[in-house]
């Protein structure tokens, strides 16, 4: 039985389907059957696929970007869910040009959707990787993030 986690489903999909194919048909019955055969429960699979759908939709939505000389202030709600280490990690990714204001906001929004999983830096790394994967204009940032995430999970998910 797989660990009942939306993140585990997302990690499996990324490592076994998205990296190879660059696309993923979320409605494909074969995919649902495969995930269930691996031991994932249908409710967790549905949550993961819904999360991916939301990411795909959010990534296409126009977003008003902040001024170049502005800085991000986290709300009390965000601070409750994203500890200091998580916020520092996001700021570091932006300073290293892995994230820009648009992708940073996507990462925060998508991470907050997984708040029941318990948000930590490990989860943020995977969320960031999947957000960048869905941004066709962010190939260089994606490559940097892949190195950061996949190096941390040697022997992780098969």
From Swiss-Prot:
Membrane-spanning parts: none
One Pfam entry name: DUF494
InterPro entries: Smg
Similarity comment: Belongs to the Smg family.
Protein name stated in the entry: Protein Smg homolog
Protein's organism: Coxiella burnetii (strain Dugway 5J108-111)
């Amino acid at each position: 039985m797989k660990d009942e986690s939306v993140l585990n489903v997302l990690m499996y999909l990324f490592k076994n389907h998205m990296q190879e194919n660059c696309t993923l048909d979320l409605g494909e019955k074969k995919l649902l059957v495969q995930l269930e055969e691996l031991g994932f429960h249908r409710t967790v699979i549905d949550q993961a696929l819904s999360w991916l759908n939301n990411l795909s939709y959010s990534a296409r939505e126009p977003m008003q970007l902040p001024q170049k000389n502005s800085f991000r202030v986290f709300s009390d709600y965000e601070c409750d869910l994203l500890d200091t280490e998580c916020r520092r990690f996001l700021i570091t990714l932006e300073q290293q040009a892995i994230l820009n204001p648009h992708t940073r906001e996507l990462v925060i929004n998508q991470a907050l959707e997984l708040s029941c999983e318990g948000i930590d830096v490990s989860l943020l790394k995977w969320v960031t990787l999947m957000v960048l994967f869905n941004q066709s204009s962010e190939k260089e940032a994606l490559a940097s993030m892949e190195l950061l995430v996949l190096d941390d999970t040697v022997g992780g998910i098969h």
